[in-house]
């Protein structure tokens, strides 16, 4: 159990049997009375959000979450198949739990899969992925008047802004947290 004073942004708690993550946290000390802790909580199963205020001394349950390294194998038409990197067990994750990372998810990528009561509830990509460019406008040397970046499509279908010298077939490194171009991967 967490005391209200231990709550912080990003902390995962359990309320009424569901896991929540604290999206925003604010400490409020009124002129008179107990300190208050205002939290914006997001249900990790449904995605719904709500605000809740705790008083000092209130207790909140810890979410029983487990994170495992798993490799994304394939999409079977309905679910995404992941394999545990230590036990080699395979699980199927519904599209709703993969939606946030789908545009950068490539086969054979090792991800962190979050489990609640032995059920996969979320997938986190590594901080950086390397993907090949499949579509890009051609670059004309000396063409700097049109701006510093151009849109390209990578092999997963995601559209990104990259420097104009990047061409089709090249592999680029992408920061998955911001979906920004980092660098061209040297062969």
UniProtKB/Swiss-Prot annotation:
Keywords: Cytoplasm, Elongation factor, Protein biosynthesis
CDD domains: S1_EF-P_repeat_1, S1_EF-P_repeat_2
Any one Gene Ontology BP term: peptide biosynthetic process
PROSITE patterns registered for this protein in UniProt: EFP
InterPro entries reported for this sequence: Elong-fact-P_C, NA-bd_OB-fold, Rib_uL2_dom2, Transl_elong_fac_P/YeiP, Transl_elong_KOW-like, Transl_elong_P/YeiP_cen, Transl_elong_P/YeiP_CS, Transl_elongation_fac_P
Pfam entry (one): EFP_N
Compartments reported by the entry: Cytoplasm
Gene3D superfamilies to which the protein is assigned, alphabetical: 2.30.30.30, Nucleic acid-binding proteins
Gene Ontology terms for molecular function: translation elongation factor activity
Pathway: Protein biosynthesis; polypeptide chain elongation
GO cellular component entries: cytoplasm
HAMAP family referenced in this protein's UniProt entry, alphabetically: EF_P
Matches recorded under PANTHER family: ELONGATION FACTOR P, ELONGATION FACTOR P (EF-P) FAMILY PROTEIN
Similarity comment text for this entry: Belongs to the elongation factor P family.
Function: Involved in peptide bond synthesis. Stimulates efficient translation and peptide-bond synthesis on native or reconstituted 70S ribosomes in vitro. Probably functions indirectly by altering the affinity of the ribosome for aminoacyl-tRNA, thus increasing their reactivity as acceptors for peptidyl transferase.
Name used for this protein in its record: Elongation factor P
Organism, scientific name: Desulfosudis oleivorans (strain DSM 6200 / JCM 39069 / Hxd3)
